Amino acid sequence: MPSGKGWKDGAAMNAIQKYFKYRQSLIDQYAKGDMTKREYLQKNYEAVVYGDIGPFRNMDTVEKALFNYQYYNALAKENKTISTTRDMDYELKRDYLEKSNYYYSRKDRATLTALRMLDFRGVVAYFVKVRSRFLKGKLFEIVIEEENIILHSTSPLVLNCLREEGVFQEESRKSLIDEYVNHRY
């Protein structure tokens, strides 16, 4: 069996490709109506948490940064969902929300890493038209056009970086994945 950094990087890249292929099949099933948004989120969560790879400490490729985005986004959404459990103790609810916010901050770090590696080339960002009053004027979409990648954030830090790089368009648009974005889970 080969050893060394090259082999590990190759195995990691194969695992990342395998994950994104599986994720695309989940997206296709959701788009066809074969699964609910909650089922999609649960299966995606299981894929990143119980898969062959975990988050990368060293995000030295765009692919690793994008995997970390998915990993931390899945954990954030799962913890946020758990926090809405009825009759949950207030302290426990707060703990889950704090974990969710922590994971969202890690997701935003991965977002910035990927964008910086791309030098913000081929990136367009804008606010998303949402039904949620809480997310209105906060949620924005980041599109990496050449790769057909869509990311979302509410981070003021990410927003400021996008503005500084001149890729944020000061308008609200319908999300490219509007049905998903505006569907509650």
Where are the regions a protein language model picked out?
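Short terminal alpha-helical segments
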Residues: 8-42
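Short, charge/polar-rich alpha-helical segments
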Residues: 9-13, 31-34, 49-73
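Non-transmembrane amphipathic alpha-helical segments
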Residues: 23-26, 65, 69-72, 76-83, ...
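Charged, low-complexity interaction regions
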Residues: 30-39, 81-94, 167
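Short linear proline/tyrosine/threonine-rich motifs used for host-factor recruitment
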Residues: 35, 40, 140-144, 151
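Short, charged, amphipathic alpha-helical segments
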Residues: 38-44, 89-109
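Amphipathic alpha-helical coiled-coil segments
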Residues: 51-58, 102-121
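A short, charged, amphipathic alpha-helix used as a generic interaction element across diverse proteins
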Residues: 155-166
